[in-house]
Amino acid sequence: MRNLLLSLAASMAIAAPALAGEARLEARGGVYWEPGNTQATAGAAAGYDADLGTGAFLGGEVSADKVLEANRRTAFGVTGRLGLKPSADSKLFAAGGYTTKNCALCEDAIHAGGGYEQGFGSRLYGKVEYRRYFTKNNAPDGNAVMAGLGLKF
């Protein structure tokens, strides 16, 4: 899995100069919950969004997130984003991807969700996002709501 994530990140870095868009780095935190358990979460993400005309974009990101609870480990993810740009400084998007398991007895997951990103000047942005984690083998599905603060390049 680590090789897949590194390959995707390298591909995004190589393709970035040929695309019209922006790279981004963010720190984020929020709440993760599953039946009977709610915990804080913190993480970081790096991504690239390419413009699809003036009103839409397509992007991808790699991420590392940690549920702040004993016996949890960092979950790594790869996510695609597709969205609209309601204004020059805002993005409304749907997202989906894959996340590694966040504990020894947990399951990896496919995730789907959506969010809103708002620019504050030319480089700073804030973001809120919801994700649903669909697990397998009858493991409980998880949910997360996160807020992030990042820089655009």
Q: Where are these predicted regions, by residue range?
A:
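Gram-negative outer-membrane beta-barrel domains
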Residues: 17-153
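Cleavable N-terminal export/targeting peptides
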Residues: 1-24
